[in-house]
C-alpha cells in the first residue's frame, strides 16, 4: 500500500476535483457489487458460529490490529472460544488457507498476522478467501466466535456483527477512491452495528535485540530519535512519540514494507524506534539501536457493554440452533 496522498485529507483540492468523476464511477461499482450480494445473485458463505467483522471504510491506518488483539483476548477472558481470520496481506505463501503460529514467517503470512498471533491466545488462519479461512478454522479448532480482520468489504463472508473503526483523520475529504480515502461511501457507516474511534495507549518501549532492556517514557523527553513506520497512518505514530516529549526524525515507509539493514544506515547514533508491526520484520538485525514501541487499544466502556451483551445472545442462539434446541 502506497502512502496516502495529502489531498485526500484536504477539504478542497485541484487534484481531488479532477478525480471526482472517477470517484463517482467507483461508488456506482461498489453499490452494484454490494447489491448483488444483497439480492442473492452473488453467494454469501454462512456458518454455524458467530462471525464478527472488524474493518473500516477508509484506506489504512485505523488501528485494526490493536483492536482485534484486544477483542480476541477479551472474548477469551470472558469464557468464549474465539478464532481470527485474515487475508494475510503482504504474505507470499504458495499454500492457503494457512494456520498462523508464533514461528510463522511474515514474508509468508504477512506482518499483521504474525503480530496478531504473538499477542492473542486463540487460533488464527490466513487466506485471501475469507470463507475458506473460516472453514479451515472450524475444521481444526473448536471456536464459537470468529473475528474477521479487515473484512468489512468482503461481502462473500456472512456476518452477525460489523464493527467499523475510525482513526484521527476521520473520513478525510469525504470522497471515495481515487479522489479520497474512502473504500465505500460514508453512508456505509449507517449500516454497521458499531463505529469505534481509534485510541491507542503507549505500553512500553523495548530493545529488539534484548527485550528485557526497556526505555522509560520519561527518558524520551528532549531525546532525539529516528521514528520508522511502514504502516497505514505513520503520522499517528510520530505524533505519539512527540507527545511523549521526543524530538522525532520521521522516516515513513510504505505500508507492509520489508526492511533491509541499509534502511537504518543513518549518519548518527540516535535510537531507532519502530512500530510493533515493523519490529516483527526486523528481529534478525543485530543492531542495538533498534527499539519497539508497543501500544494497546483503548476501547470505550459503552461499546464494551453493548457489544458483549449482543454477542453473548448471538452465540447462545447459534449454539441452540446447532444443538437443535
From Swiss-Prot:
Its EC number is 2.7.1.130. It holds the Pfam family LpxK. InterPro entries: LpxK, P-loop_NTPase. GO terms for biological process: lipid A biosynthetic process; lipopolysaccharide core region biosynthetic process. Pathway: Glycolipid biosynthesis; lipid IV(A) biosynthesis; lipid IV(A) from (3R)-3-hydroxytetradecanoyl-[acyl-carrier-protein] and UDP-N-acetyl-alpha-D-glucosamine: step 6/6. Transfers the gamma-phosphate of ATP to the 4'-position of a tetraacyldisaccharide 1-phosphate intermediate (termed DS-1-P) to form tetraacyldisaccharide 1,4'-bis-phosphate (lipid IVA). This is Tetraacyldisaccharide 4'-kinase. It comes from Coxiella burnetii (strain CbuG_Q212).
Amino acid at each position: 500500500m502506497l502512502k496516502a496522498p495529502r489531498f485526500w485529507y484536504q477539504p478542497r483540492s485541484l487534484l481531488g476535483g479532477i478525480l471526482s468523476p472517477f470517484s463517482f464511477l467507483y461508488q456506482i461499482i461498489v453499490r452494484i457489487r454490494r447489491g448483488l450480494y444483497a439480492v442473492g445473485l452473488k453467494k454469501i458463505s454462512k456458518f454455524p458460529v458467530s462471525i464478527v467483522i472488524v474493518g473500516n471504510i477508509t484506506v489504512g491506518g485505523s488501528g485494526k490490529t490493536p483492536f482485534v488483539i484486544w477483542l480476541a483476548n477479551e472474548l477469551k477472558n470472558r469464557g468464549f472460544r474465539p478464532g481470527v481470520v485474515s487475508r494475510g496481506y503482504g504474505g507470499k505463501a504458495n499454500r492457503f488457507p494457512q494456520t498462523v503460529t508464533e514461528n510463522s514467517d511474515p514474508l509468508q503470512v504477512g506482518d499483521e498476522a504474525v503480530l496478531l498471533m504473538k499477542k492473542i491466545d486463540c487460533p488464527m488462519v490466513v487466506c485471501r478467501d475469507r470463507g475458506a479461512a473460516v472453514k479451515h478454522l472450524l475444521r481444526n479448532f473448536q471456536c464459537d466466535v470468529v473475528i474477521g480482520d479487515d473484512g468489512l468489504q468482503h461481502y462473500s463472508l456472512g456476518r452477525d456483527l460489523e464493527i467499523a473503526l475510525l482513526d484521527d483523520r476521520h473520513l478525510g475529504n469525504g470522497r471515495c477512491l481515487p479522489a479520497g480515502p474512502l473504500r465505500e461511501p460514508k453512508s456505509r457507516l449507517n449500516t454497521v452495528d458499531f463505529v469505534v474511534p481509534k485510541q491507542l495507549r503507549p505500553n512500553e518501549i523495548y530493545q529488539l535485540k534484548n527485550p528485557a532492556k526497556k526505555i522509560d517514557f520519561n527518558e524520551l523527553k528532549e531525546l532525539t530519535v529516528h521514528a520508522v513506520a511502514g504502516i497505514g497512518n505513520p503520522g499517528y505514530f510520530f505524533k505519539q512519540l512527540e507527545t511523549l516529549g521526543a524530538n522525532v526524525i520521521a522516516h515513513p515507509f510504505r505500508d507492509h514494507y520489508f526492511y533491509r539493514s541499509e534502511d537504518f544506515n543513518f549518519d548518527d547514533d540516535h535510537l531507532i524506534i519502530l512500530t510493533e508491526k515493523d519490529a516483527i520484520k526486523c528481529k534478525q538485525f543485530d543492531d542495538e539501536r533498534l527499539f519497539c514501541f508497543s501500544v494497546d487499544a483503548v476501547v470505550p466502556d459503552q461499546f464494551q457493554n453493548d457489544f458483549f451483551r449482543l454477542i453473548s445472545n448471538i452465540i447462545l442462539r447459534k449454539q441452540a440452533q446447532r444443538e437443535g434446541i
